[in-house]
UniProtKB/Swiss-Prot annotation:
<comment type="subunit">
    <text>Homodimer.</text>
</comment>
<dbReference type="InterPro" id="IPR038251">
    <property type="entry name" value="PdxB_dimer_sf"/>
</dbReference>
<feature type="binding site">
    <location>
        <position position="176"/>
    </location>
    <ligand>
        <name>NAD(+)</name>
    </ligand>
</feature>
<feature type="binding site">
    <location>
        <begin position="127"/>
        <end position="128"/>
    </location>
    <ligand>
        <name>NAD(+)</name>
    </ligand>
</feature>
<feature type="binding site">
    <location>
        <position position="147"/>
    </location>
    <ligand>
        <name>NAD(+)</name>
    </ligand>
</feature>
<feature type="binding site">
    <location>
        <position position="259"/>
    </location>
    <ligand>
        <name>substrate</name>
    </ligand>
</feature>
<dbReference type="InterPro" id="IPR006139">
    <property type="entry name" value="D-isomer_2_OHA_DH_cat_dom"/>
</dbReference>
<dbReference type="InterPro" id="IPR024531">
    <property type="entry name" value="Erythronate-4-P_DHase_dimer"/>
</dbReference>
<dbReference type="GO" id="GO:0016618">
    <property type="term" value="F:hydroxypyruvate reductase [NAD(P)H] activity"/>
</dbReference>
<dbReference type="GO" id="GO:0005829">
    <property type="term" value="C:cytosol"/>
</dbReference>
<dbReference type="GO" id="GO:0030267">
    <property type="term" value="F:glyoxylate reductase (NADPH) activity"/>
</dbReference>
<comment type="similarity">
    <text>Belongs to the D-isomer specific 2-hydroxyacid dehydrogenase family. PdxB subfamily.</text>
</comment>
<feature type="active site">
    <location>
        <position position="238"/>
    </location>
</feature>
<dbReference type="Pfam" id="PF00389">
    <property type="entry name" value="2-Hacid_dh"/>
</dbReference>
<dbReference type="GO" id="GO:0033711">
    <property type="term" value="F:4-phosphoerythronate dehydrogenase activity"/>
</dbReference>
<feature type="binding site">
    <location>
        <position position="67"/>
    </location>
    <ligand>
        <name>substrate</name>
    </ligand>
</feature>
<dbReference type="InterPro" id="IPR036291">
    <property type="entry name" value="NAD(P)-bd_dom_sf"/>
</dbReference>
């Protein structure tokens, strides 16, 4: 049995080698010929699964994507061909939410505002948007939700229309898939018309899919230099990056918001376990058993934590400025976008830090945020 995996999928080679012959290749450059005699294909979001790629897939029975997003896969085509498909919904939700919080903490420090006084506008209330809302609840930060599809489906949460969210939010953070059809397409959801309405004190963050934001329109908006700020982890035509847009961004990173080590381990193990079920095999993987010990110290609190403490804890785990600096330095090199993703450092989640303190420290909000807590 031949299993073709993306070479940049952590832990995949060691796990899938238990089930058959593993072939590792670059996910972005896969061709139809690569799928000849392949039984299973394990990918990430850089691989477009379409008719062209599958044209020589004479034995393919299973496709798994170790990502939460699925818009890179033609699911209708797989169903038509009788090929089983699975994804890893929610695998990266923690990493993306922590990325957003890191960006806001640094911007708050740089520009002298408090995120606790801001209203967040979360566009897309799926796995990632919902987890970010959970984090904001833990910190008692106000937010608005926009997701017309979930609202139509009867989701009991309180939603607002996009125009209201754009008007009332200080921070607009995008967590939608990319869709071009249907009643609520997200392609260029944030285009020239929307951008022209945004205030100069607002912040836009896109850690969803690049084409959700019209990058040319965003560039023109930022060229006004009136205080409006934008953070992009994804780009409309990635791996190509508009080098005129880049210096206008507050932070820019190569599609790594959800690239925490825990998230990647979750994604790989989720599709591994699904493939084992498909094969009726008994093997199962637990992401926690794959993770190395985090090189992050335990933290002891001797008094009630405050906003400054929280800022320090968040930056101890992940400081977006590190990735931003590397991105700006390396992006002009040929192939840099994918290389930075391939060589990405072992970033951890809040859960990798154990915070020790007494009951008087009120550690519950930190626990709800994801930190590991020990009361003494």
């Amino acid at each position: 049995m031949k299993i073709l995996i993306d070479e940049n999928m952590p832990y995949a080679a060691e796990l899938f080698s238990e089930l058959g012959e593993v072939i590792a290749k670059s996910g972005r450059t896969l061709t139809a010929d690569d799928l000849i005699d392949v039984d299973a294909l394990m990918i990430r979001s850089v691989t477009k699964v379409n008719a062209e790629l599958l044209s020589q897939a004479n034995k393919l029975k299973f496709v798994g994507t170790a990502t939460a997003g699925m818009d890179h896969v033609d699911q209708a085509l797989l169903k038509e061909k009788g090929i089983f498909f699975t994804a890893a919904p929610g695998c990266n939700k923690v990493g993306v939410a922590e990325y957003v919080l890191s960006c806001l903490m640094v911007l708050a420090q740089q520009h002298g505002f408090s995120i606790f006084e801001k209203t967040f506008g979360i566009v897309g209330a799926g796995q990632v948007g919902s987890y970010l809302a959970q984090c904001l609840d833990a910190l008692n930060i106000s937010y608005l939700l926009n997701d017309p599809i979930k609202e139509q489906e009867g989701d009991s949460r309180s939603f607002v229309v996009l125009d209201e969210l754009l008007e009332k939010s200080d921070v607009i953070t995008l967590h939608t898939p990319i869709t071009r059809d249907g009643e609520y397409p997200t392609h260029h959801l944030i285009g020239q018309k929307v951008l022209s309405k945004l205030r100069n004190d607002q912040i836009l963050i896109n850690a969803a899919r690049g084409p959700v934001v019209d990058n040319q329109a965003l560039k023109q908006r930022l060229l006004k230099q009136d205080g409006f700020k934008a953070v992009l982890d994804v780009f409309e035509f990635e791996p190509d990056v508009d080098m005129e847009l880049l210096p206008l961004l507050s932070f820019a990173t190569p599609h790594i918001a959800g690239y925490g080590l825990e998230g990647k381990a979750r994604g790989t193990t989720m599709i591994f376990n699904s493939y084992c079920e498909f094969l009726k095999r008994s093997e199962r993987a637990d992401p926690q058993t794959l993770l190395p010990i985090a090189p992050i110290p335990n933290v002891r609190l001797n008094q009630q934590w405050d906003h400054s403490t929280l800022h320090n804890l968040i930056q101890l785990v992940y400081d977006v400025r590190k990735d931003d600096a590397v991105f700006r330095k390396e992006i002009t090199t040929v192939g840099a976008f994918d290389k930075m993703r391939k060589d990405y450092w072992d970033r951890r989640e809040y859960s990798a830090i154990t915070i020790t303190g007494t009951q008087c420290c009120d550690l519950t909000p930190l626990q709800q945020l994801g930190f590991t807590i020990e009361e003494v």
